[in-house]
C-alpha cells in the first residue's frame, strides 16, 4: 500500500510539473513584443469578443451544471456530485485559460513573424503548448488527486462503488462542458466564417481578413472559441473519461486481487510519464535548415512518441511489473503484454496522424483532386469534396480495427483500454499542435488588417497553412481516440451490468432482471443499434442547421452594413465589428442547447422507453447497450468523414491563393471562377470540419457515460 501511495504522489507531481511548465510558458509569451498600436487595437477587439462569448457560454452551462450537481447529490452521493463538479470546473478552466493566452499570443506572433519565420513559429507553438499541457496536467490532477482523497484520506477500497461512481461522475462533468463548448464554439466560428466568406469573398470580391469586412473580427474570435477552447474541452474530456473508464475496468476485472491497487494506478502512471515526455518534446520544435514548419512540429511529436515508450516502461516497472498479473475471461494478462498494448496505442496515433495529413494536406492527391474539380464549377467541387470525405474514413477505420483486435489478443478488453490510455497520454503535445492553428490564423488576420508588409503576411500565411493541417490532424486523433475510448466505456457498461446482475442481493433492482443478451437475433438489440446509429446523423444535422442559420444572419448583417455604409468599401467608414460578434454570440448560445441535450437524454429515453414497451429490464438494458454501439460505429464514420472532408475542402481553397495549375497546365489565381467554386466548397466544408464533425466526438462519449451513470443510479436507488 505504501508503494501505491508513493506512485500516486509521483503521478500528482507529474501533473503539477505540467501546470508549472504552462505557467512558465504563459509568462514567456506575455513578455513578447505586441507590435504597433494598430495591431494592438485589432487584438484587443478580438480579445474582448472572445472573452464576452466564453463568459456568456459558461454562464449558460453553469445553470445546467447546478441542476446536474444537485441531481447527482440526490440520486447518487455527495462524492459523485463533487466528482461532477471537479470535472466540469477543470474542463472550463482549461478552455478559458487556453483561450486567454491564445488571444494574447496572436498579436505577438504577428510581430515575431515580421522579424523571422522561426520567431513566429516558436511563439505560436509555445502558446499552443500552454493549452496542451494545461489539458493534460489538469485532467491528470483532477482524476489522481480525487482518487487520492477517496482511497488514501477517506480510506475507501479502490474497487468500492463510491470511488467508481465518483470517478465516472468526474468524467460526466468533463463531458457536459465539452459538448457545449465544442458545439457552441463551432456554431460561432463557422457562422462568422461562412457568412463573412459568402458576402466578402464571393459577392464583394475582397480578400480574407480584409478590415472592410464587418465579420472579420467575429471570424478571428471564432477561431479561438472553437479551435482553442473547444478542442481543449474535447480532449480534456476524452483524457479524463478514458483514464476513468480504464480504472473502472481494472476495478471490475481485478476486484479482490492483490494487484488491484497497482492495476488502478497503472493508467494514471502512464499519463504521468507521458505528460513529462510531452514537456520534453516541446523543446524539439525548432525550424530546421530546410525551413519546413510541418517538419519542425513533427520533430516534437516524434520525440514525444519515442520518449513515451520509455515512459510506458517506467509505468510498468513502478506498478504492474512485467510478469503475469491475473486472468480475465480466461485470458492470462501479463505486464509485458500490457506494455505492448500501450505501444500499439502510440503506433495507432502515429498512423492516424499520417493518414489525416494525407487527406487534408496541400499538394496531396485528395486536396488536389478537389482543386481540379473546382475548375469545372461549383457543383463538381462539392461532389469531389463529398467523395474525398467518404473515402477518408476507410484507412483510419482499418487502423482502429487493427488496434482493437491486436490489443484484445494480447490482454483482452483491459489491453484495449491501456492502448487508448497511451494514445491520450500524449494529448499535451497533440493539443499544442491544434492550439497552434488559431494563433497563426489570427496572426495572419492581424497582419492583414493592420496593413503590415506583404512579406509579413507571407510568413503568417505559411504558418497558417500548416496550422490548418495540424487542426485537421488533431481532429483525426481526437476522433480515433474518442471512438476507442467509447469502446472502453461500452466495455465498462457491459461489465458493470454483469457485476450488478451477479450481486442481485446487494442491488435488488437487478435481482429479477434475468440474463441480458446482446445477440443480434434479439429484436431489441437490433432496434437499439438502429436508434443509436441515428443519433450522430441527427446531431450532425442539427449542428449544420444551426451554422446555416447563424451564417445566414451574418450574411444579412454584412449586406446591411455594406448597403447602409457605402464608405466601408472605400475605407472612409469603419464597419461595426461588435454588432456581428454580439449577433453570433446570441445565436451560438441559443442554438447549442437542444442539440447538446440530445446525446445526454437519448440513453435515458432508450432504457425507459423499451422498459415501458417490453416490461423487461433485460430487454431494456440490451437495447441500451446496443444503442451505445450504434452511436460508436456511426459516430466514428460521421466524425472522420466530416473533419477530413472539411479539411480537404479548406486546403483546396487555399491552393488557389498562390495560384493552382490544373491538369491542362492552366494557372488559376485568386478571384478566378475556379477560386470562387473552391470558396463554395469551403463554405460547405467549414461547418463540416469545425462544428458538426468535432462535436460528434463528445456526443459519442457522453451517451456511453450517461449509460454508466444510469446503472449507478438504479443500483443506488435499490
From Swiss-Prot:
<feature type="site" description="Important for ion transport">
    <location>
        <position position="227"/>
    </location>
</feature>
<feature type="binding site">
    <location>
        <position position="197"/>
    </location>
    <ligand>
        <name>Mg(2+) 1</name>
    </ligand>
</feature>
<feature type="transmembrane region" description="Helical">
    <location>
        <begin position="385"/>
        <end position="405"/>
    </location>
</feature>
<feature type="site" description="Important for ion transport">
    <location>
        <position position="234"/>
    </location>
</feature>
<feature type="transmembrane region" description="Helical">
    <location>
        <begin position="133"/>
        <end position="153"/>
    </location>
</feature>
<feature type="transmembrane region" description="Helical">
    <location>
        <begin position="413"/>
        <end position="433"/>
    </location>
</feature>
<keyword id="KW-1133">Transmembrane helix</keyword>
<keyword id="KW-0472">Membrane</keyword>
<feature type="transmembrane region" description="Helical">
    <location>
        <begin position="524"/>
        <end position="544"/>
    </location>
</feature>
<keyword id="KW-1003">Cell membrane</keyword>
<keyword id="KW-0479">Metal-binding</keyword>
<feature type="transmembrane region" description="Helical">
    <location>
        <begin position="112"/>
        <end position="132"/>
    </location>
</feature>
<feature type="binding site">
    <location>
        <position position="220"/>
    </location>
    <ligand>
        <name>Mg(2+) 2</name>
    </ligand>
</feature>
<feature type="transmembrane region" description="Helical">
    <location>
        <begin position="472"/>
        <end position="492"/>
    </location>
</feature>
<feature type="binding site">
    <location>
        <position position="650"/>
    </location>
    <ligand>
        <name>Ca(2+)</name>
    </ligand>
</feature>
<keyword id="KW-0106">Calcium</keyword>
<feature type="transmembrane region" description="Helical">
    <location>
        <begin position="593"/>
        <end position="613"/>
    </location>
</feature>
<feature type="binding site">
    <location>
        <position position="686"/>
    </location>
    <ligand>
        <name>Ca(2+)</name>
    </ligand>
</feature>
<feature type="site" description="Determinant of potassium independence">
    <location>
        <position position="471"/>
    </location>
</feature>
<feature type="binding site">
    <location>
        <position position="193"/>
    </location>
    <ligand>
        <name>Mg(2+) 1</name>
    </ligand>
</feature>
<protein>
    <recommendedName>
        <fullName>K(+)-insensitive pyrophosphate-energized proton pump</fullName>
        <ecNumber>7.1.3.1</ecNumber>
    </recommendedName>
</protein>
<keyword id="KW-0813">Transport</keyword>
<keyword id="KW-0812">Transmembrane</keyword>
<comment type="subunit">
    <text>Homodimer.</text>
</comment>
<feature type="transmembrane region" description="Helical">
    <location>
        <begin position="695"/>
        <end position="715"/>
    </location>
</feature>
<keyword id="KW-1278">Translocase</keyword>
<comment type="similarity">
    <text>Belongs to the H(+)-translocating pyrophosphatase (TC 3.A.10) family. K(+)-insensitive subfamily.</text>
</comment>
<keyword id="KW-0997">Cell inner membrane</keyword>
<feature type="transmembrane region" description="Helical">
    <location>
        <begin position="81"/>
        <end position="103"/>
    </location>
</feature>
<feature type="binding site">
    <location>
        <position position="223"/>
    </location>
    <ligand>
        <name>Mg(2+) 2</name>
    </ligand>
</feature>
<dbReference type="GO" id="GO:0005886">
    <property type="term" value="C:plasma membrane"/>
</dbReference>
<feature type="transmembrane region" description="Helical">
    <location>
        <begin position="300"/>
        <end position="320"/>
    </location>
</feature>
<feature type="transmembrane region" description="Helical">
    <location>
        <begin position="6"/>
        <end position="26"/>
    </location>
</feature>
<keyword id="KW-0375">Hydrogen ion transport</keyword>
<comment type="function">
    <text>Proton pump that utilizes the energy of pyrophosphate hydrolysis as the driving force for proton movement across the membrane. Generates a proton motive force.</text>
</comment>
<feature type="binding site">
    <location>
        <position position="441"/>
    </location>
    <ligand>
        <name>Mg(2+) 2</name>
    </ligand>
</feature>
<feature type="binding site">
    <location>
        <position position="190"/>
    </location>
    <ligand>
        <name>substrate</name>
    </ligand>
</feature>
<feature type="transmembrane region" description="Helical">
    <location>
        <begin position="54"/>
        <end position="76"/>
    </location>
</feature>
<dbReference type="GO" id="GO:0009678">
    <property type="term" value="F:diphosphate hydrolysis-driven proton transmembrane transporter activity"/>
</dbReference>
<feature type="transmembrane region" description="Helical">
    <location>
        <begin position="335"/>
        <end position="355"/>
    </location>
</feature>
<feature type="transmembrane region" description="Helical">
    <location>
        <begin position="620"/>
        <end position="640"/>
    </location>
</feature>
<feature type="binding site">
    <location>
        <position position="689"/>
    </location>
    <ligand>
        <name>substrate</name>
    </ligand>
</feature>
Amino acid at each position: 500500500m505504501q508503494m501505491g501511495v508513493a506512485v500516486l504522489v509521483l503521478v500528482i507531481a507529474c501533473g503539477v510539473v505540467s501546470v508549472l511548465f504552462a505557467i512558465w510558458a504563459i509568462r514567456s509569451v506575455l513578455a513578447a513584443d505586441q507590435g504597433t498600436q494598430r495591431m494592438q487595437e485589432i487584438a484587443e477587439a478580438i480579445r474582448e469578443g472572445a472573452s464576452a462569448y466564453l463568459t456568456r457560454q459558461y454562464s449558460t452551462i453553469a445553470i445546467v451544471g447546478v441542476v446536474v450537481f444537485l441531481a447527482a447529490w440526490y440520486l447518487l452521493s455527495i462524492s459523485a456530485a463533487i466528482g461532477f463538479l471537479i470535472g466540469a470546473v477543470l474542463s472550463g478552466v482549461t478552455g478559458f485559460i487556453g483561450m486567454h493566452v491564445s488571444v494574447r499570443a496572436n498579436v505577438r506572433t504577428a510581430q515575431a513573424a515580421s522579424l523571422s519565420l522561426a520567431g513566429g513559429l516558436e511563439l505560436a507553438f509555445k502558446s499552443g503548448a500552454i493549452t496542451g499541457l494545461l489539458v493534460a496536467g489538469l485532467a491528470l490532477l483532477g482524476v489522481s488527486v480525487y482518487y487520492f482523497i477517496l482511497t488514501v484520506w477517506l480510506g475507501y477500497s479502490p474497487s468500492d462503488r463510491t470511488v467508481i461512481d465518483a470517478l465516472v461522475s468526474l468524467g460526466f462533468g468533463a463531458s457536459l462542458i465539452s459538448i457545449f463548448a465544442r458545439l457552441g464554439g463551432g456554431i460561432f466560428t463557422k457562422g462568422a466564417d461562412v457568412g463573412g466568406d459568402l458576402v466578402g469573398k464571393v459577392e464583394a470580391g475582397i480578400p480574407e481578413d480584409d478590415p472592410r469586412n464587418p465579420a472579420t473580427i467575429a471570424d478571428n474570435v471564432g477561431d479561438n472559441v472553437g479551435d482553442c477552447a473547444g478542442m481543449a474541452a474535447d480532449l480534456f474530456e476524452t483524457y479524463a473519461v478514458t483514464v476513468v473508464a480504464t480504472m473502472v475496468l481494472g476495478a471490475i476485472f481485478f476486484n479482490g486481487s492483490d494487484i488491484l491497487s497497482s492495476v488502478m494506478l497503472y493508467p494514471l502512471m502512464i499519463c504521468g510519464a507521458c505528460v513529462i515526455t510531452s514537456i520534453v518534446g516541446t523543446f524539439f520544435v525548432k525550424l530546421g535548415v530546410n525551413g519546413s514548419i510541418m517538419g519542425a512540429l513533427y520533430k516534437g511529436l516524434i520525440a514525444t512518441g519515442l520518449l513515451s515508450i520509455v515512459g510506458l516502461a517506467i509505468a510498468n516497472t513502478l506498478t504492474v511489473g512485467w510478469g503475469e498479473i491475473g486472468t480475465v475471461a480466461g485470458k492470462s494478462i501479463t505486464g509485458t503484454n500490457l506494455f505492448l498494448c500501450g505501444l500499439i496505442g502510440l503506433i495507432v496515433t502515429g498512423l492516424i496522424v499520417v493518414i489525416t495529413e494525407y487527406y487534408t494536406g496541400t499538394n496531396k492527391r485528395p486536396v488536389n483532386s478537389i482543386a481540379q474539380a473546382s475548375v469545372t464549377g461549383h457543383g463538381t467541387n462539392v461532389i469531389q469534396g463529398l467523395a474525398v470525405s467518404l473515402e477518408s474514413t476507410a484507412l483510419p477505420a482499418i487502423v482502429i480495427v487493427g488496434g482493437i483486435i491486436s490489443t484484445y489478443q494480447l490482454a483482452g478488453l483491459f489491453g484495449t483500454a491501456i492502448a487508448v490510455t497511451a494514445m491520450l497520454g500524449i494529448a499535451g503535445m497533440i493539443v499544442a499542435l491544434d492550439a497552434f492553428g488559431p494563433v497563426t490564423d489570427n496572426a495572419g488576420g492581424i497582419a492583414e488588417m493592420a496593413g503590415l508588409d506583404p512579406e509579413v503576411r507571407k510568413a503568417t500565411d505559411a504558418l497558417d497553412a500548416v496550422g490548418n493541417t495540424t487542426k485537421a490532424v488533431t481532429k483525426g486523433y481526437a476522433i480515433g481516440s474518442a471512438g476507442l475510448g467509447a469502446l472502453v466505456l461500452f466495455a465498462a457498461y457491459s461489465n458493470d451490468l454483469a457485476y450488478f446482475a451477479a450481486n442481485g442481493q446487494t442491488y435488488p433492482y437487478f435481482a429479477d432482471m434475468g440474463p441480458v443478451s446482446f445477440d443480434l437475433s434479439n429484436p431489441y438489440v437490433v432496434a437499439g443499434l438502429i436508434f443509436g446509429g441515428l443519433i450522430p446523423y441527427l446531431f450532425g444535422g442539427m449542428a449544420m442547421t444551426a451554422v446555416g442559420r447563424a451564417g445566414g444572419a451574418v450574411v444579412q448583417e454584412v449586406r446591411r452594413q455594406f448597403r447602409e455604409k457605402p464608405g466601408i468599401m472605400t475605407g472612409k467608414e469603419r464597419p461595426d465589428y461588435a454588432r456581428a460578434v454580439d449577433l453570433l454570440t446570441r445565436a451560438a448560445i441559443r442554438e447549442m442547447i437542444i442539440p447538446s441535450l440530445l446525446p445526454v437524454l437519448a440513453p435515458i429515453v432508450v432504457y425507459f422507453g423499451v422498459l415501458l414497451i417490453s416490461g423487461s429490464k433485460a430487454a431494456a438494458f440490451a437495447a441500451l447497450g446496443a444503442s451505445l454501439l450504434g452511436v460508436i460505429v456511426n459516430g466514428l464514420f460521421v466524425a472522420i468523414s466530416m473533419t477530413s472532408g472539411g479539411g480537404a475542402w479548406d486546403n483546396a481553397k487555399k491552393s488557389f491563393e498562390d495560384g493552382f495549375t490544373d491538369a491542362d497546365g492552366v494557372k488559376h489565381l485568386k478571384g478566378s471562377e475556379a477560386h470562387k467554386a473552391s470558396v463554395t466548397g469551403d463554405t460547405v466544408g467549414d461547418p463540416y470540419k469545425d462544428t458538426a464533425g468535432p462535436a460528434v466526438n463528445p456526443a459519442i462519449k457522453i451517451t456511453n457515460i450517461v449509460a454508466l451513470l444510469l446503472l449507478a443510479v438504479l443500483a443506488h436507488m435499490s
